[in-house]
Amino acid sequence: MATQKKPDLSDPTLRAKLAKGMGHNYYGEPAWPNDLLYVFPIVIMGSFACIVALAVLDPAMTGEPANPFATPLEILPEWYLYPVFQILRSLPNKLLGVLAMASVPLGLILVPFIENVNKFQNPFRRPVATTVFLFGTLVTLWLGIGAALPLDKSLTLGLF
């Protein structure tokens, strides 16, 4: 097992190189050409090999062929569109549903402006952003679970 030499940060030539912005790893090895020519291609090829291996070993199922004469009673979108589908399904007016969907990203865009005086990284020291995140997560889960249920049970999740 080889021992790697740590850089001597008291060396004036090394300090001059670092002051000029010469990129080094934490152990003093220059980023060019070592990282860019050796490490990055290995990581890229390894990622590509993992993706190809997963595609070969576990191919995607195509499902049953479409039959236009045998449609399901209620057509549901993909799982990640359940909350949006539930908003459109539960509101009686289509324009109101579209406005409700448009208000979600607008509300998320406004959160940093509401709490711009608080510069902390800790989420417990940013109560507005934390509250908006928790409320949004709960509402999204509620809408997503409700979309899989019939319309009469969707808003109460069948509990009441």
From Swiss-Prot:
The chain crosses the membrane at residues 36-56, 95-115, 131-151. One of its GO terms (biological process) is photosynthetic electron transport chain. It is a multi-pass membrane protein. Keywords: Electron transport, Membrane, Photosynthesis, Thylakoid, Transmembrane, Transmembrane helix, Transport. One of its GO terms (cellular component) is plasma membrane-derived thylakoid membrane. Pfam families: Cytochrom_B_C. GO terms for molecular function: electron transporter, transferring electrons within cytochrome b6/f complex of photosystem II activity; electron transporter, transferring electrons within the cyclic electron transport pathway of photosynthesis activity; oxidoreductase activity. Its main location: membrane. The keyword rRNA-binding does not apply. It is found in: Cellular thylakoid membrane. The 4 large subunits of the cytochrome b6-f complex are cytochrome b6, subunit IV (17 kDa polypeptide, PetD), cytochrome f and the Rieske protein, while the 4 small subunits are PetG, PetL, PetM and PetN. The complex functions as a dimer. Component of the cytochrome b6-f complex, which mediates electron transfer between photosystem II (PSII) and photosystem I (PSI), cyclic electron flow around PSI, and state transitions. Belongs to the cytochrome b family. PetD subfamily. HAMAP family: Cytb6_f_subIV (MF_01344). PANTHER family: CYTOCHROME B (PTHR19271:SF40). This is Cytochrome b6-f complex subunit 4.
